A protein has these predicted regions:
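N-terminal Rossmann-like NAD(P) cofactor-binding module of classical short-chain dehydrogenase/reductase
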Residues: 90, 204-205
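A glycine-/small-residue-rich N-terminal strand-loop-strand element
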Residues: 70-94
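Glycine-rich phosphate-binding loop and adjacent beta-alpha segment
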Residues: 214-286
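Mid-domain Rossmann-like dinucleotide-binding core that forms the NAD(H)/NADP(H) cofactor-binding site
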Residues: 84, 125-195
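A short acidic, Gly/Pro-enriched loop at the edge of an enzyme's catalytic core
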Residues: 197-203
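NAD(P)H dinucleotide-binding glycine-rich loop of Rossmann-like/cofactor-binding domains
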Residues: 48, 88-151
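C-terminal hydrophobic helical "lid"/dimerization subdomain
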Residues: 1-2, 268-322
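N-terminal glycine-rich beta->alpha transition that marks the start or flank
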Residues: 2-3, 14-16, 23-70
Length: 322
């Protein structure tokens, strides 16, 4: 019998609604792997789910959050080849990752090559896959285009700068002045967060919503694309912002607005998410990507991990480590 520790959202609320339970790690069902987790990402989406503010599908409490994991396969479902045992893997889980053991569909798991650092790989499934989709598939960024990134020092923000640089785009990162040096390490031009008007851009990637979304639309050049992928601003209203995006799209002219949510792609096209993740793992192994880890927090301190991830000064990805 293998015991499991897991973070539980007992009800919606602040960080103190999180607790750590101990139970028996279930044997994996058909088509699934059980992964002994070595690192799990803590995302703004986890915080919004806990607070009852996430705009997408959320399990009813009590549930275990956690969008992404890396770890070692320690058990396999009855129809899964034994060759998976002992393999190091990374996967997008959507929920259930904040635990010592997580259940992962074998079809979603990507194997890690021998030398790859597991903590760096744990930054890929949510932040880097989101960034890849935003740049390649939604905004369809072309080399030489000006791309403006809000929240450039965060986990998705740094991923956007990292991948955008490889695309040959001119990247501009909006961040507090204390984070400008970090933005520059990714080869991007820092933009002061509180400046009155945003620089004009071909593509704007906005995770804040509200007044920020309106400023983003105003900053678009002809033929420009605005992609909203979150509502992190306290004054953002998801229904109002989504309506606004639809209205902007109906205006005459060639500027376009869209909304993107990775969880929708993961449910509709899990094969594509896995293909992108495999490609990112290869690029990480080649030293072309540089994920930034903001903090490593023990699994037994989930409230602290949520506070760190929710802090505007967090730079990069927060990891829970069992």
């Amino acid at each position: 019998v293998t015991s499991r520790r897991r973070v539980v959202v007992t009800r919606t609320g602040g960080p103190d609604v999180l607790r750590v339970d101990t139970d028996e790690a279930p044997e994996p069902a058909a088509g699934r792997l059980r992964v002994r987790v070595t690192a799990a990402g803590v995302a703004r989406a986890d915080i919004l789910m806990r607070a009852g503010r996430y705009p997408g599908r959320v399990p009813t409490p009590p549930f275990t959050p956690g969008w992404d994991v890396t770890g070692v396969v320690d058990a396999v479902g009855p129809d899964v080849p034994d060759r998976w045992l002992g393999r190091r893997v990374v996967a997008l889980t959507l929920t259930g990752g904040h635990a010592s053991h997580a259940s992962v569909p074998v079809a979603d798991a990507v194997e890690l090559p021998g030398t790859l650092q597991e903590h760096a790989a744990a930054c890929l499934p949510l932040a880097y896959v989101t960034a890849h989709e935003l740049l390649h598939h939604v905004a369809r960024v072309r080399p030489g285009e000006r791309v403006l990134v809000h929240g450039a020092a965060g986990s998705v923000g740094t991923a956007l700068l990292d991948i955008g640089r490889l695309l040959g785009a001119d990247m501009y990162g909006i961040a507090a002045s204390r984070d400008h040096a970090l933005v520059e390490t990714y080869g991007a031009e820092p933009v002061e967060r509180d400046r009155a008007a945003l620089p004009r851009a071909d593509v704007v990637l906005d995770m804040a919503g509200g007044a920020t979304l309106r400023a983003s639309w105003r900053s678009l050049l002809p033929g420009g694309r605005l992609v909203s992928y979150g509502f992190l601003s306290p004054e953002a209203s998801p229904p109002r912002d989504l309506l606004r995006l639809r209205l902007w799209n109906a205006l005459p002219g060639d500027r376009r607005a869209a909304f993107y949510r990775l969880s929708a792609t993961a449910r509709r096209r899990p094969d594509r998410v896995r293909a992108v993740l495999r490609d990112l793992v290869t690029q990480l192994g080649e030293g072309r990507l540089h994920p930034r880890i903001a903090a490593r927090v023990p699994l037994d301190q989930p409230a602290r991990a949520h506070r760190v991830a929710d802090d505007p000064t967090a730079r990069g990805k927060v990891l829970l480590v069992p």
